[in-house]
UniProtKB/Swiss-Prot annotation:
Keywords: Calcium, Calcium channel, Calcium transport, Endoplasmic reticulum, Ion channel, Ion transport, Membrane, Plant defense, Signal, Transmembrane, Transmembrane helix, Transport. It comes from Arabidopsis thaliana (Mouse-ear cress). This is Calcium-permeable cation-selective channel WeiTsing. Residues 1-25, 73-90, 134-148 are cytoplasmic. GO terms for biological process: calcium ion transport; defense response to fungus; monoatomic cation transport; protein complex oligomerization; response to fungus; sodium ion transport. Changing residue 37 to W/Y: Severely impaired channel activity leading to reduced ability to trigger defense responses starting with cytosolic Ca(2+) increase, but normal oligomerization. The chain crosses the membrane at residues 26-46, 52-72, 91-110, 117-133. The keyword Endoplasmic reticulum applies.
Length: 148
């Protein structure tokens, strides 16, 4: 049996978990890209001055580094989820979500530092809950030892 994921690719169903995670992860990545693009647009509207780049040079450099890590982990996640479903590809996926969210928070901190701190706390609680629930799922069958 096969299903169609959010990016119109057929994926085999073997329990449904890889498909659910791929759909969830694709939705998170779409939201992250829209948020980062929206914040960049907001920065253009709020400050029409070139001095913003010079006063917040470290923040923009940090944003670029986070986006680079986000892109590398996103590509790695896309390759790993299709090849080998399991814990490591999911943690790589959550890591890419982490860096994409941090990139957005760095841009928000340029506009309002206090608001970005509140968002960071809420976002960290959410990410911790997702990773905790993901890593503590009971397995369907106990691990078997190899034959001696």
């Amino acid at each position: 049996m096969e299903t169609v994921s959010a990016v119109n690719q057929t994926l085999p169903i073997s329990g449904g978990e890889p498909v659910k995670f791929t759909t969830y992860s694709a939705a998170v990545h779409k939201v992250l890209v829209m948020i980062n693009a929206g914040i960049l647009g907001l920065l253009q509207l709020v400050s029409q001055q070139s001095s913003v780049l010079e006063t917040h040079k470290a923040a923009f450099l940090c944003f670029c580094v986070f986006i680079l890590f986000y892109a590398v982990l996103r590509v790695r996640e896309a390759m790993d989820v299709r090849l080998q479903p399991g814990l490591v590809p999911r943690l790589i996926g959550h890591g890419s979500h982490l860096f994409g969210g941090l990139a957005a928070l760095v841009l928000v901190s340029v506009v309002s530092t206090a608001f970005s701190i509140v968002l960071f706390l809420l976002w960290f609680i959410w990410l911790s809950a997702v990773v905790y629930l993901e890593t503590n799922k009971p397995s369907a069958c106990p691990p078997q030892l190899p034959p001696v």
